[in-house]
A protein has these predicted regions:
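FIC/Doc superfamily catalytic core
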Residues: 1-130
Length: 130
């Protein structure tokens, strides 16, 4: 697989701030290392796991944000949008209802859904953009 286009930290930070403005929540970074780790997760998977499929990279791009809680608030929203942006940058769109997204992201943040299960869900919800 050719190297994907990655979501930059500044984009994730802008998305996070936008979500807080739109939906409310506590601002601020809770854990710098958790954010750095979350942002590097997909790239590390691509670099060191030659069998990684694109949905697994998408899952990795949001998993660390939703699960590691680098921000004081808005981690699930930011994690989901990081996945959607990453997919979009690479020619894919996420096709899921709001209810499906909420269920998946709540399950992910609560530890009821692991990264591979998220990737499996994404496999059936990613479509090539037109």
């Amino acid at each position: 697989m050719a190297e994907p286009r990655w979501v930059e930290r500044l984009v994730v930070e802008a998305v996070h701030l936008d979500q807080l403005r739109e939906h409310g929540g506590l601002s601020g970074l809770r854990d710098e290392n958790a954010l750095e780790s979350a942002l590097a997760r997909a790239h590390q998977k691509w670099q060191y796991d030659s069998r990684a499929r694109f949905p697994e990279l998408v899952a990795a791009s949001g998993f660390g944000i939703a699960r590691n809680h680098p921000y004081r608030d808005g981690n699930k929203r930011t994690g989901f949008l990081a996945m959607a942006i990453f997919a979009g940058l690479n020619g894919y769109a996420l096709d899921a209802t709001d209810a499906e997204v909420v269920t998946v992201m709540l399950g992910l943040a609560a530890g009821h859904l692991n990264e591979q299960e998220l990737a499996d869900w994404l496999t059936s919800h990613l479509a090539r953009s037109k």
